[in-house]
Amino acid sequence: VITEHGQVVNNQDIMVVHLHLKEGETIAPHNHPGRQIFFTVVEGEVEVYLNEEETYPLVPKKVLDFDGEARISVKALKESDIFVYLVVKR
C-alpha cells in the first residue's frame, strides 16, 4: 500500500508520483518529454491545463492520458490526492 508522497516508483519503464495538494495550490507549467502520462485523482477535484489552451476538470474515477511533450499545469479546486504515472515511450 502506497501512503508516502513524492516519487513512489522510479525505474527504467515507469515513474509513479503521489501528490497531495491543498485547495488553491498549483503546479507550475512543465512537461515530461519521452513519456506518456496518466493523471488520476484519488480524492478531491483539480483542473489540469495542457499547453495553456486545454482545460480538463478531474475528479475521482477519471483518468487523463496525454503525451509528455505537452506542457501541464494543475490547480486544486479542492484538497486533492493524485497519482501520476509517467511511462517511458519505446
Language-model features: where?
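A short glycine-rich, His/Asp/Glu-containing loop-to-beta-strand
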Residues: 1-28, 35, 87
